[in-house]
Amino acid sequence: MEEKFLEALAAAWEKAVALGVRIRPVTDMAGVHRVLSGHRESDGFFQLADQGRLDLSMEALAVKKQFTMLFSDEEANNALERLLTAGYTFK
C-alpha cells in the first residue's frame, strides 16, 4: 500500500508541477511521515490552495480512505486540519 501511495503522490505532483507549482519531491514514506507529523504544510501546499487544487497535495492524499491506514491519528489529523484551514472541500 505504501508503494501505491508513493505512486499516487508522484502522479499528483507531476500534475502540480505542470501547473507551475514548485515542489521538492519526497520519495519515501519516512519523508511523508516527517512532513505530516511536523508543523509545516507540504511543499507547494499554498500554491495549490491558490489554484484551487489542494486535491494534488500530500495532505489530501493522506486523508483518502484507501491510504488512511498508513498514517497515525496525529498525522491524519494534521493533514485534515491543514486542508480545512485552507478551505478545502471534500468531493
Regions picked out by a protein language model, each given a short descriptive name:
Residues 52-91:
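Amphipathic alpha-helical binding modules
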Residues 3-54:
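Amphipathic alpha-helical packing elements
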